[in-house]
Swiss-Prot record:
This is Beta-hexosaminidase. Pathway: Cell wall biogenesis; peptidoglycan recycling. One of its GO terms (biological process) is regulation of cell shape. GO terms for cellular component: cytoplasm. Belongs to the glycosyl hydrolase 3 family. NagZ subfamily. GO terms for molecular function: beta-N-acetylhexosaminidase activity. Keywords: Cell cycle, Cell division, Cell shape, Cell wall biogenesis/degradation, Cytoplasm, Glycosidase, Hydrolase, Peptidoglycan synthesis. It comes from the Bacteria. It comes from Vibrio cholerae serotype O1 (strain ATCC 39541 / Classical Ogawa 395 / O395). Gene3D superfamilies: Glycoside hydrolase, family 3, N-terminal domain. It is found in: Cytoplasm. The keyword Cell wall biogenesis/degradation applies. The active site is at 173 (proton donor/acceptor), 242 (nucleophile).
């Protein structure tokens, strides 16, 4: 599979989608709420994506929970990460949440949810209650449980947004945030610990500039991705860019420049979403590349949604997540 992830417009593939998915540089499709009508339609869409690609291809979605849950009707509701630490049995619930989220996606032939968020603190507009906590130990304890749940059912894990997005106020979807702190050691401690624990299969860097360290956003910085992530922290998994169509990546230039910089800096796979013309421009201008190690991120189990819903574990987890949402939602 190639390095580029892109999106499709609707519930079914268009003729253009089918053609573009055969391009050797395409390695993944990220789905959005607009791609989901019901459970059977989603299964049919994912089957069509895999058939059109004619080779292994990754299918992913942002389904971490709370406001970032693309598939809702017909799926269990997953709470925002912040809620787990507020509950008495929060660690147990976080593991159930990770398992439930991953299991329901796998039952619909989705390989990945880009999760969990390992950022610390609730102040950032882009992160907020997507964070597990405001201190290192709270984030580590509950994210570790969430990761265990994901892995137990066969889904690869993605830590984000390296080296820490939680302390900036600005939203990288809308602008390039600058983290002016002289040290981000506390934020980094979370990523370091999870890398050392061997529980992260992939990493997604932030579209954030940390000027005391490097002038480029982490997503396009060889300092962060090669020197720190690979060499200092010893991370061996796949590195995804965040969506390069976000305004946070604009400091790297146009679509082709952003993609080239991210790949040269150390990203293995890049996301270009919601701008088909930009994705086509990237495909037309990037050299043909393959990322054979990315096949390790394909889902490890296969089962139907009806089989899953018969499990006591599913019934308990789904009910517990709903109760947690009702308990803490204002």
């Amino acid at each position: 599979m190639g390095p580029l992830w892109l999106d499709v417009a609707g519930y079914e593939l268009s003729a253009e989608d089918r053609e573009i998915l055969q391009h050797p540089t395409v390695g993944g499709v990220i789905l959005f709420g607009r791609n989901y009508h019901d459970n059977q339609q989603l299964l049919a869409l994912n089957k069509a994506i895999r058939q059109a690609a004619k080779r292994p291809i990754l299918i992913g979605v942002d389904q971490e929970g709370g406001r970032v849950q693309r598939f809702r009707e017909g799926f269990s509701r997953i709470p925002p990460a912040q809620y787990y630490a507020r509950a008495e049995n929060g660690v147990e619930l976080a593991e159930q949440g990770g398992w439930l989220m991953a299991a329901e996606l796998i039952a619909h032939d989705v390989d990945l949810s880009f999760a969990p968020v390992l950022d610390m603190g609730f102040a950032c507009k882009a992160i907020g209650n997507r964070a597990f906590g405001e201190d290192v130990q709270t984030v580590l304890k509950h994210s570790s449980a969430f990761l265990r749940g994901m892995k137990a059912v066969g889904m690869a894990t993605t830590g984000k947004h390296f080296p820490g997005h939680g302390a900036v106020i600005a939203d990288s979807h809308l602008e390039t945030p600058y983290d002016e702190r002289e040290t981000i050691a506390q934020d980094m401690a979370i990523f370091r610990a999870q890398i050392e624990a061997g529980v992260l299969d992939a990493m997604m860097p932030a579209h954030v500039v940390y000027p005391h360290y490097d002038a480029q956003p982490a997503s396009g910085s060889s300092y962060w991705l090669k020197q720190v992530l690979r060499e200092e922290l010893g991370f061996k998994g796949i590195v995804f860019s965040d969506d390069l169509s976000m305004e946070g990546a604009a400091v790297m230039g146009g679509p082709v420049e952003r993609s080239h910089q991210a790949l040269v800096a150390g990203c293995d796979m890049i996301l270009m979403c919601n701008k088909r013309e930009a994705a086509v421009e990237v495909l037309d201008n990037l050299p043909i590349m393959v990322v054979p190690q990315a096949t390790a991120l394909l889902k490890k189990q296969q089962f139907s949604y009806s089989e899953l819903k018969r499990l006591d574990r599913w019934q308990q987890a789904s009910a517990n997540m709903q109760r947690l949402i009702e308990q803490f939602s204002v």
